[in-house]
């Protein structure tokens, strides 16, 4: 039952510890620098019983339980306290992200601007929108007559209509107080009402008392209403929390007054200094009055005197029912000014101004124009107020303010009226049909604004003498008021902050011209703000606002995370008053309330009782570490439901809309990417979706979707279906957003668990663990225990049956779950009675410290382990948890990695050569994964050699296998239903070449029938990785000339001459399937990249995970080895160097062989021989081989630890392990043949040893007397698992150090390896069948996120474009995201471009049904974007925003002329020349869904910025993305073969008309016209139905040749009318095959 030979002298644990010690120290130093300040107080605040209970029931360790207890004892665990703590903890995490403070500051500023704009635009376009079941002021018809009010409330009324920061739109004190009730409705309508309440108070609570608003109906009852309202207020019960909220509300009023007085007008900039003086004077006066009010209210609360409250209201000026101007000035003017003469003067001025405004309004004939000018941010119900009342209110505002300010305050009043300029609405607003109408309306509003301003200015100037007297008297009275002098200093310290906040956040500060010409800031995902996007630098207000955000975010970063702070504290007042925090508070409070309700039900608590700490810790453990089933069940319980047993679509949509509105989650890639309706439809749909993307996306702005009532239930074809909990949990397997609660559980993890994990990692070896464990297994029905050595490393749990042997078990830990099994649990080993108890069972049962823990995988399979030491069990549990994380940006398995060198390869010629160079210098292992692999494909066709066969893939792999390199190939096992790619023959061919060192796995064995492995991966030594769209197969090789003929078989020999539009390649035939003389080949355009560093390790992890899963899924591969990752290289430090002072560049270590001309080296691999170089030699090292002979046929036996070529002209061996500088003079032989390619990128990539490659050269010696340095250990231990060299290498390292001290010659120190400048994140599409894990569709989420965040342009090259916009199939919404982004650009009048480069049509015969269907659906995806835009903007020119193009080439072949499309197979997304996505994923459901084809891509952001231009303005572009796009355009425009420096410089600016129209579109149109004229219906894009298509070539004539010579480059237009008259074919064949290609 159990056989095990214990080790005699050494174990693996000290080996691993010694190897990783330096690396762990470096990692700990980096972590401590980037972690939030976490200093637990370590106070015993819990009982041992609580600890024991939580340790047994939760997923936390004892240390984590203690720290969580420590936190929760410092916060209030009520609804408000827990909500505030979540918000603070979230911000604390985000500010510690690199550039987090900058990104958050820009995000908060931009959201303030955008949010107010969207809200008010939506109000204006939905004036009649009311919720029937809402209890907010939106639902009550407001027929109130606006009356003149006090100075403070009049200003605040205007403020709330303008700023909408903290205050609601009502102005009387009783409404403000009534808005602060703590009763949360559990009704489902609550979320629909939140939209209405968002700006009514900070805590966003329902307004239950609207009676006071109705008291304002009659203007003739002003004085009576004043007394009545004061008596109503005095009868209210005030709480301390309400007073605090009121204080905040009053502060926001103060802020909004500052905002109005600080709004700039371009016509009066020469008075700016004078304005600032009076701005601060006015602010100081208002602060005094509001401070007095707040202090007196607090005094009222303490004294509980109703009479005092009335006095407060009267003194504070909060009552809004004062009718005449005498009551307006009661709190600020002395009794001497409250005379009849003063009242008469004010009334006369008011009537005069009102008449002037009315005349101007009637003259213009545009009532809405005046509304927009005076009350741009008016509440919807207030907008319905008659014009006369609005005019009266405006008149009251100006008149009242004029009597309380100095002589020059007319400038501030002027700005008050014109500050609310109409700004063009954002996406989703449908009132403006086209941009022409929008411009006309804007011009008319500007004219009205100017006239109104002039009238107001004249009126104020005429009354300025009296105003001066009034202000002077007011100041004297304030100085004589002792109460105000004692209480007016509370808010003065923050006056500057408040002023700059509202000056910058007010949307009116941005003029129409500057705002519409430039997009929103791209800081929050690009980093630095691009000032060049505007014609002038950012305003002072914006700079001050962002700086204030930065300062307070810096305070959060420096504070102790466990200090119990919240944003309610004064030091965070600026952040707390932002619109984003108000929105977060409301949403999180809603979720926390749902959570508390669930806890009360689960633990049978009283209705109003708050959960205990134990309850919260237990639930948080499920949220963050629970199983898939547990998390999904918790999500089901958190939804507010009508029935406990089922959840309806509208109920789930309600919660998702709220979480989706957490902008910070989406910006940082943590949220649920995609519209809420799309997510819900994916969960509830039966088969294909019945709701198209237009229907399931509301017309209102997306960021407001949470606050609006869901429109889905009112849409046609909507069916409010339901799911039971069992079915809901079942569907969570195929929807990764459900177990995450659509991002909310990620938020909880970031707030509470990640800080603890980081804190513990800084003091505990958390990432690795090793030791002996017993694991349970069953032999039939008999349970047995097996003792194995296990180690946790790089995301895998590895078990060894014997030490120093190959692993017997490898478990991928990605998104697994581990938990300690308490002794009381029925599955604990003490509770299980075994029929047969052997010695091992007795040994386990007899140990009191024996601890059980269970590991659960994504499919709920479990594996139980038993450790005889509780400490060791805890280490394993912690290490497993650390290695099982997967919720990184875009929900990817990999986190973004810094300092990566990325090399792009355009077309197959450069890519194949780069792969050949890397394979040639492989030293330990090679991983290859592909959709199709051809063993005979040639990798280097430009080199001159007498034996060109040595460049074939099979020859290269055969050579490396004979040298001892392990080669693992993972290939798609295609089904005959789909196609025949000859994978069976490939497997047989490769394994016959070298059975020991080449292993090939075909996957999947049987099911699924339709899905494929579409990843294209090459990994060499786990150090350099190649990914992209190119397979190592026939038909992929091409260069910058895109030849359509090759009669002499120079570039495309044999079967490599392919045209898959005529005949698809079958198997791996060596014969050509098309006639070279009469049929053209189809050129192939593709893009791939190479990566190094930790990004290459992430690609390695992906391959190893897939390999091990494929091995386990088929018993035929039981004997194949498991793969594991190599020990991680500390890439953050320079490569180690031997003592350089003893070495000379031209001196060899081996004195006996200076020329190293030995042709044969016999290398003994016996474990007892200490003179063997096992680390760097190219020997065949296997588990059962003792003597290996390697023959070298040339003089340079150099091997590179970085897979790079070395000096081929040097006969002497370079034996130093130093990093050698790259010598370009030695690369002449490798760069002789480049086909006169003038492209810098191509020249740089033909040889991987150039300066742009991933690393510099290192060389070592393969000699039987030469030994390696111990410093090379970390860089040479491979991941091969049946090589026993790991302990042997480590055992020999100390004995071999002295070999590097020969030849005492001085050598100056050499520079370390150069780091890259790119940040790279690997994203992919995998699921259970393809990788043995939960569904991951991070590629799709990244595409959507980057399209939504684009600012200037989107450039896409892809093989397919099958997406959803306006129809039900397919399900992905890439096209819809593009449509929404163009719609936003139209509404903002932005210059924005979207360019799609697609093939003319997909591979396959044009007469085939599936090819016709793909053409149809591609055209539907494109025309869907255009159709929906034209519906909304009938007069828009879509060509200004969208360009669809293809590539085509021609050539003369004898007496005929060939032409064929250049097949665009690349999968590239470039956004704003800042960020790029490159990989294997097409734009269709197969690639993006995650549950279908397996895909892999890389998101690349380069921190190295270069000077560029956008729309003619200076711009900083990322070097990688910018150079890649420019190189691609040079290829497409023919600038490679015909260089034009001027044209190459112009294409740097894609956005400007002179490039987009005059170069790109003009060249495409001209080339398309020539092709149409010459070739006619012989090319498919000129045919509207298949009967018109006449495949073939044309005869060569001088006229045709002369016309074709007018074609420049290869660019043509994509014709959406191709086969437009052909009906959509339907057949059984199309239903099966085509659905596989399109949707499945």
UniProtKB/Swiss-Prot annotation:
Positions of the PLD phosphodiesterase domain:
1009-1036, 1460-1487
Q: Which GO terms describe its biological process?
A: phospholipid catabolic process; phospholipid metabolic process
Q: Which UniProt keywords apply?
A: Hydrolase, Lipid degradation, Lipid metabolism, Repeat
Region (Disordered) residue spans: 122-247, 264-283, 439-499, 521-541, 1149-1315
Show the ranges annotated as biased composition (Low complexity): 133-193, 264-273, 467-499, 1149-1274, 1282-1296
Q: How is its activity regulated?
A: Inhibited by butan-1-ol.
**Catalysis: reaction(s):** a 1,2-diacyl-sn-glycero-3-phosphocholine + H2O = a 1,2-diacyl-sn-glycero-3-phosphate + choline + H(+)
SUPFAM superfamilies, A to Z: Phospholipase D/nuclease
What general EC class does the enzyme of this chain belong to? Answer: hydrolase
Show the ranges annotated as biased composition (Basic residues): 1297-1306
Catalytic center residues? 1014, 1016, 1021, 1465, 1467, 1472
Q: Where is the composition biased (Polar residues)?
A: 122-132, 232-247
One GO MF term? phospholipase D activity
Q: What is its EC number?
A: 3.1.4.4
Pfam families per the record?
Answer: PLDc, PLDc_2
Q: Which Gene3D superfamilies match?
A: Endonuclease Chain A
- In this chain, composition skew of type Acidic residues spans 197-231, 521-534
> Record's family?
Belongs to the phospholipase D family.
Report the protein's function: Plays a role in cell growth. Hydrolyzes membrane phospholipids, such as PtdCho (phosphatidylcholine), producing the free headgroup and PtdOH (phosphatidic acid; signaling molecule on its own). Involved in the inhibition of actin-based motility and endocytosis. Its inhibition causes complete collapse of F-actin organization.
Protein name, please?
Phospholipase D C
Q: Which gene encodes it?
A: pldC
């Amino acid at each position: 039952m159990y056989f095990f030979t214990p080790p005699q002298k050494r174990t693996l644990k000290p080996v691993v510890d010694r190897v990783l010690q330096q690396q762990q120290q470096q990692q700990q130093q980096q972590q401590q620098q980037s972690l939030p300040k976490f200093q637990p107080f370590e106070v015993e605040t819990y009982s041992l019983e609580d600890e024991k209970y939580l340790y047994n029931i939760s997923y936390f360790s004892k240390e984590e339980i203690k720290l969580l207890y420590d936190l929760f004892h410092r916060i209030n665990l009520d609804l408000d306290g827990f909500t505030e703590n979540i918000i603070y903890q979230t911000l604390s995490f985000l500010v510690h992200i690199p550039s987090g403070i900058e990104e958050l500051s820009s995000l908060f500023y931009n959201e303030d601007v955008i949010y107010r704009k969207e809200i008010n635009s939506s109000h204006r376009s939905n004036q009649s929108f009311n919720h029937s079941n809402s209890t907010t002021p939106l639902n009550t018809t407001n027929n109130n007559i606006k009356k003149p009010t006090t100075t403070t409330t009049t200003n605040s009324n205007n403020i709330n209509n303008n700023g909408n920061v903290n205050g609601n739109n009502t102005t009387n004190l009783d409404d403000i107080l009534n808005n602060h009730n703590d009763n949360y409705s559990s009704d489902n309508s609550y979320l629909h009402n939140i939209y209405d309440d968002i700006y009514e108070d900070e805590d966003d609570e329902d307004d239950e008392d609207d009676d006071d608003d109705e008291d304002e109906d009659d203007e003739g009852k002003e004085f009576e209403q004043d007394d009545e309202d004061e008596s109503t207020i005095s009868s209210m019960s005030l709480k301390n929390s309400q007073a605090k909220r009121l204080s905040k509300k009053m502060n926001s009023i103060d802020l909004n007054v500052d905002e109005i007085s600080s709004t700039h007008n371009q016509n009066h900039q020469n008075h700016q200094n004078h304005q600032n003086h009076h701005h601060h004077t006015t602010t100081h006066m208002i602060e005094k009055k509001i401070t007095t009010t707040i202090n007196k209210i607090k005094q009222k609360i303490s004294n509980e005197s109703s009479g005092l409250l009335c006095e407060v209201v009267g003194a504070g000026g909060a009552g809004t029912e004062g009718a005449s101007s005498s009551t307006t000035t009661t709190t600020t003017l002395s009794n001497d000014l409250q005379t009849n003469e003063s009242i008469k003067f004010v009334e006369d001025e008011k009537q005069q101004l009102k008449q002037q405004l009315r005349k101007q309004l009637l003259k213009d004939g545009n009532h809405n124009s005046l509304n927009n000018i005076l009350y741009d941010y008016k509440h919807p119900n207030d907008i319905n107020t008659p014009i006369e009342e609005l005019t009266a209110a405006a008149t009251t505002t100006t008149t009242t303010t004029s009597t309380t300010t100095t002589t020059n305050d007319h400038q501030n009043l002027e700005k008050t009226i014109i500050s609310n300029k109409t700004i063009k609405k954002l996406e989703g607003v449908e009132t403006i049909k086209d941009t022409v109408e929008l411009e006309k309306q804007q011009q008319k509003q500007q004219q009205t604004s100017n006239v109104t301003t002039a009238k107001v200015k004249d009126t104020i100037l005429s009354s300025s003498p009296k105003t001066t007297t009034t202000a002077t008297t007011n100041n004297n009275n304030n100085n004589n008021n002792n109460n105000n002098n004692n209480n007016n200093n509370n808010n003065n310290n923050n006056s500057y902050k408040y002023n700059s906040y509202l000056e910058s956040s007010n949307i009116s500060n941005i003029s129409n011209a500057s705002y519409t010409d430039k997009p929103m800031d791209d800081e929050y995902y690009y980093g630095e703000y691009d000032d060049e996007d505007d014609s002038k630098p950012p305003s002072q207000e914006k700079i001050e606002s962002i700086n204030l955000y930065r300062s307070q975010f810096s305070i959060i970063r420096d504070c102790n995370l466990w200090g119990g702070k919240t944003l309610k504290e004064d030091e965070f007042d600026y952040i707390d008053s932002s619109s984003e925090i108000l929105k977060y508070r409301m949403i999180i409070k809603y979720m926390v309330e749902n959570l508390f309700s669930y806890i009360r039900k689960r633990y049978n608590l009283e209705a109003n009782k708050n959960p205990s700490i134990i309850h919260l810790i237990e639930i948080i453990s499920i949220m963050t570490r629970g199983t898939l089933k547990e998390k999904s069940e918790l999500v089901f319980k958190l939804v507010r439901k009508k029935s406990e047993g089922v959840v309806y679509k509208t109920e789930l949509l309600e919660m998702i809309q709220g979480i989706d509105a957490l902008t910070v989650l989406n910006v940082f890639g943590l949220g649920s990417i995609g519209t809420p309706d799309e997510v819900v439809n994916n969960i509830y749909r039966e088969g294909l979706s019945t709701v198209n993307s237009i229907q399931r996306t509301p017309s209102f702005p997306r960021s407001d979707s949470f606050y609006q009532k869901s429109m889905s239930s009112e849409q046609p074809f909507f069916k409010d279906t339901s799911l039971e909990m069992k079915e809901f949990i079942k569907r969570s397997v195929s929807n990764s957003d459900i177990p995450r609660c659509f991002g909310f559980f990620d938020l909880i993890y970031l707030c509470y668990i990640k800080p603890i994990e980081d804190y513990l990692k800084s003091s505990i070896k958390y990432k690795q663990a090793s030791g002996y464990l017993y694991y349970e297994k069953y032999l039939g029905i008999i349970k047995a225990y097996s003792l194995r050595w296990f180690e946790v490393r790089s995301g895998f749990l590895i078990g060894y049956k014997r030490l120093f042997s190959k692993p017997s078990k490898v478990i991928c830990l990605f998104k697994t779950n581990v938990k300690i099994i308490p002794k009381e649990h029925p599955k604990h080993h003490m509770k299980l009675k075994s029929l047969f108890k052997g010695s091992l069972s007795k040994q386990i049962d007899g140990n009191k410290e024996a601890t059980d823990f269970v590991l659960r995988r994504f499919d709920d399979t479990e594996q139980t382990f038993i450790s005889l030491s509780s400490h060791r069990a805890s280490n394993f549990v912690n290490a497993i948890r650390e290695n099982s994380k997967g919720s990184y940006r875009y929900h990817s398995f990999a986190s973004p990695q810094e300092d990566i060198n990325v090399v792009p390869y355009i077309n197959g010629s450069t890519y194949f050569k780069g792969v050949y160079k890397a394979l040639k210098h492989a030293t330990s292992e090679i991983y290859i994964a592909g959709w199709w692999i051809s063993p005979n494909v040639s990798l280097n066709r430009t080199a001159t050699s007498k034996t060109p066969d040595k460049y074939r893939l099979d020859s290269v792999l055969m050579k490396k296998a004979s040298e001892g390199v392990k080669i693992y190939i993972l290939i798609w096992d295609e089904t005959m239903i789909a196609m025949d790619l000859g994978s069976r023959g490939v497997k047989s061919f490769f394994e016959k070449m070298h059975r020991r060192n080449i292993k090939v796995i075909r996957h999947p064995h049987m099911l699924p029938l339709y899905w494929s492995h579409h990843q294209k991966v090459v990994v060499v030594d786990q150090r350099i990785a190649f990914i992209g769209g190119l397979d190592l197969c026939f038909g992929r090789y091409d260069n910058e000339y895109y030849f359509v003929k090759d009669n002499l078989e120079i570039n495309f020999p044999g079967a490599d001459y392919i045209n898959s539009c005529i005949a698809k390649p079958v198997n791996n035939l060596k014969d050509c399937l098309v006639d070279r003389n009469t049929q053209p080949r189809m050129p192939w355009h593709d893009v791939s990249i190479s990566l190094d560093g930790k990004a290459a390790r992430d690609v390695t992890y992906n391959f190893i995970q897939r390999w091990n899963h494929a091995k386990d899924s088929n018993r035929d591969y039981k004997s194949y080895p498991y793969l594991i990752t190599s020990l991680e290289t500390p890439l953050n430090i320079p490569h180690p160097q031997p003592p350089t002072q003893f070495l000379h560049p031209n001196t060899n270590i081996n004195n006996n062989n200076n020329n190293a001309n030995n042709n044969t080296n016999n290398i003994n691999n016996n474990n007892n021989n200490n003179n063997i170089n096992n680390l760097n030699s190219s020997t065949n090292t296997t588990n059962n081989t003792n003597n290996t002979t390697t023959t070298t046929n040339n003089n340079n036996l150099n091997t590179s630890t970085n897979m790079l070529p070395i000096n081929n002209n040097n006969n002497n061996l370079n034996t130093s392990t130093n990093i050698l500088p790259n010598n370009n003079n030695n690369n002449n032989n490798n760069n002789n043949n480049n086909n006169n390619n003038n492209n810098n990128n191509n020249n740089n990539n033909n040889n991987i040893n150039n300066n742009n490659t991933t690393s510099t050269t290192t060389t070592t010696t393969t000699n039987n007397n030469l030994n390696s340095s111990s410093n090379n250990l970390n860089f040479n231990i491979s991941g091969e698992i049946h090589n026993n060299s790991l302990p042997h290498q480590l055992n020999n390292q100390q004995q071999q150090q002295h070999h590097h001290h020969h030849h005492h010659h001085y050598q100056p120190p050499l520079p370390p390896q150069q780091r890259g400048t790119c940040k790279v994140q690997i994203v992919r599409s995998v699921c259970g069948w393809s990788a043995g894990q939960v569904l991951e569709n991070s590629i799709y989420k990244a595409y959507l996120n980057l399209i939504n965040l684009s600012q200037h342009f989107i450039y896409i090259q892809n093989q397919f474009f099958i997406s959803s916009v306006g129809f039900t199939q397919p399900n992905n919404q890439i096209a819809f995201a593009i449509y929404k982004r163009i719609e936003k650009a139209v509404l903002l009048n932005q210059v924005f471009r979207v360019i799609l480069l697609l093939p003319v049509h997909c591979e396959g015969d044009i007469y085939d049904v599936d090819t016709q269907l793909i053409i149809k659906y591609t055209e539907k995806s494109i025309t869907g974007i255009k159709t929906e835009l034209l519906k909304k903007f009938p007069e828009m020119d879509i060509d200004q925003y969208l360009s669809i193009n293809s590539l085509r080439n021609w050539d003369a072949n004898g007496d005929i002329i060939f032409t064929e499309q250049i097949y665009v197979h690349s999968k590239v997304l470039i956004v704003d020349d800042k960020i790029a996505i490159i990989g294997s994923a097409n734009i269709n459901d197969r690639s993006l869904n995650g549950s279908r084809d397996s895909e892999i891509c890389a998101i690349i952001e380069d921190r190295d910025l270069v000077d560029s231009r956008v729309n003619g303005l200076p711009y900083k572009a990322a070097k990688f993305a910018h150079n890649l796009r420019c190189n691609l355009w040079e290829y497409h425009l023919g600038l490679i073969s015909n260089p034009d420096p001027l044209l190459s410089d112009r294409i740097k600016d894609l956005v400007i008309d002179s490039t987009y129209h005059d170069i790109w579109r003009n060249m495409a149109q001209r080339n398309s016209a020539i092709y149409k004229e010459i070739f006619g219906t012989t090319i498919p894009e000129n045919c509207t139905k298949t009967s018109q298509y006449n495949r073939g070539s044309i005869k060569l004539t001088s006229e045709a040749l002369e016309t074709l010579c007018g074609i420049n480059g290869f660019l043509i237009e994509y014709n959406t009318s191709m086969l437009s008259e052909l009906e959509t074919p339907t057949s059984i064949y199309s239903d099966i095959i085509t659905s596989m290609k399109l949707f499945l």
